[in-house]
């Protein structure tokens, strides 16, 4: 299973360094959840504010969405990745806890 990352610029073309930073940061989400299949990064600029939205799709039809706005696009990217890390870790814990039952206790 390969990870596909799509990056879209809206209203402005961002420099390659910003695009590389975004791809590098979101790629780290696979550390927390290895079932990530697709990541869509949307970089936007309206007026003086940058907006970054990241949509992560994983196995079992799981979707995670993070959004941030700031004057600095790099700060936006970092904030979005932090939000998504929390979402992904929480979802993984929920899946892990769901599979952990009272199996041995029920038999006794």
Regions found by a protein language model. Name each.
Residues 1-108:
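N-terminal, polar/charged subdomain of small-to-medium soluble alpha/beta proteins
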């Amino acid at each position: 299973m390969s990870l596909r990352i799509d990056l879209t610029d809206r209203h402005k073309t961002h420099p390659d360094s910003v695009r590389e930073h975004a791809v590098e940061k979101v790629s780290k989400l696979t550390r927390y959840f290895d079932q990530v299949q697709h990541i869509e990064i949307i970089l936007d600029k309206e007026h003086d504010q940058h907006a970054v939205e990241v949509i992560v799709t994983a196995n079992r039809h799981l979707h995670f969405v993070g959004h941030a706005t700031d004057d600095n696009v790099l700060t936006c990217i970092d904030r979005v990745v932090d939000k998504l890390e929390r979402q992904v870790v929480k979802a993984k814990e929920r899946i892990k806890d769901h599979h952990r039952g009272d199996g041995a206790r029920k038999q006794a």
